[in-house]
Amino acid sequence: MNIPKILNNNLVLKRIFCRNYSVKVLGIETSCDDTAVAIVNEKREILSSERYTERAIQRQQGGINPSVCALQHRENLPRLIEKCLNDAGTSPKDLDAVAVTVTPGLVIALKEGISAAIGFAKKHRLPLIPVHHMRAHALSILLVDDSVRFPFSAVLLSGGHALISVAEDVEKFKLYGQSVSGSPGECIDKVARQLGDLGSEFDGIHVGAAVEILASRASADGHLRYPIFLPNVPKANMNFDQIKGSYLNLLERLRKNSETSIDIPDFCASLQNTVARHISSKLHIFFESLSEQEKLPKQLVIGGGVAANQYIFGAISKLSAAHNVTTIKVLLSLCTDNAEMIAYSGLLMLVNRSEAIWWRPNDIPDTIYAHARSDIGTDASSEIIDTPRRKLVTSTIHGTERIRFRNLDDFKKPKSPKTTE
């Protein structure tokens, strides 16, 4: 898409001749159950932010209902946009663009955000920026940490995704591994819900956070009490549906045995440890593969809702340190779905003059196709080796024990022939 010269020049002139001018972008996020709006500027300031989620209805319905989410977005977006503008002390004419999530996510939910963004951009004659939700998660670190430089590795873990990638630039990503089925957040959520009522202290708390709290109360070896086999998936890919299925089957067997009571904290600790070991084993393969090619970035950014889990983050950090990689976690407030990351990703695309932007209001279509699934970047899985030289001893990701590896070459050495005297 060609950038209209007059719009491009206006933005450049503002930044050159207005000493205190800072580009401002309104972001809209509706990929799932969070209705979110935010305004950020080029100085990396969050001028305003609003988020709304109907958790009570989700608890009543036992999870996320896409139609309910869409209705929530439609009813609340106008109010949240107006409040953001008021809180920021900004009028629409002071904005430089509108950014909106277009993929991936629940299509029916995405459409509501897209519709609101199109209407706002056309009404106020602003450029419209389509943003990739998962890229925004990775790029959100740039909003709060100026030490991060391209290229950096990005591990994104959420209720809908799990992927291992490298961010080479704002819109240039390489995908090295992803979940072939399920996600870590959904796995933990569904298994935990089958445990039943976790107690009144967890009312109003996301079930994933409840699992982490309960796991912290487990016995010393609680993380080993309910083990399952890790999924066998090629290269750096993952499978969380297999983990979910194994634990649901285990729960069913335990309940059929009337003599066995389930220790909830130990069960949560085992589930959490299994998810962490699976992620770590695949991240290790990624590290080994890129290290052999001498192109492993020295910074690793962890984002997405599951990154808020301190145990899983700790396991990844511990493994990364063993590979001489610095781990950086996105702020807790930016780990879950938010509009700040959408606005700032859009701002980066704007100042980099992205060809994906609809610069002229008259060129903005009446609708934009929403995609349920969309890879974060180009497929680079062919660069991942099938069998790394060293195998991670996954049990060592727990606690303070030093990370250990097994050199696979040792297993291939021929045994010395026995001698007889």
Swiss-Prot record:
It catalyses: L-threonylcarbamoyladenylate + adenosine(37) in tRNA = N(6)-L-threonylcarbamoyladenosine(37) in tRNA + AMP + H(+). Substrate binds at residues 156-160, 189, 208, 212, 308-309, 336. The keyword S-adenosyl-L-methionine does not apply. Binds 1 divalent metal cation per subunit. A divalent metal cation binds at residues 133, 137, 337. It holds the Pfam family TsaD. Its cofactor is a divalent metal cation. InterPro entries: ATPase_NBD, Gcp-like_dom, KAE1/TsaD, TsaD. GO terms for molecular function: metal ion binding; N(6)-L-threonylcarbamoyladenine synthase activity. It is found in: Mitochondrion. Disruption phenotype: Enhances longevity, resistance to oxidative stress, and perturbs mitochondrial reticulum morphology. Keywords: Acyltransferase, Metal-binding, Mitochondrion, Transferase, Transit peptide, tRNA processing. GO terms for cellular component: mitochondrion. GO terms for biological process: tRNA threonylcarbamoyladenosine modification. Signal peptide: none annotated. Homodimer. NCBIfam families: gcp_kae1. Required for the formation of a threonylcarbamoyl group on adenosine at position 37 (t(6)A37) in mitochondrial tRNAs that read codons beginning with adenine. Probably involved in the transfer of the threonylcarbamoyl moiety of threonylcarbamoyl-AMP (TC-AMP) to the N6 group of A37. Involved in mitochondrial genome maintenance. This is Probable tRNA N6-adenosine threonylcarbamoyltransferase, mitochondrial. It comes from Caenorhabditis elegans.
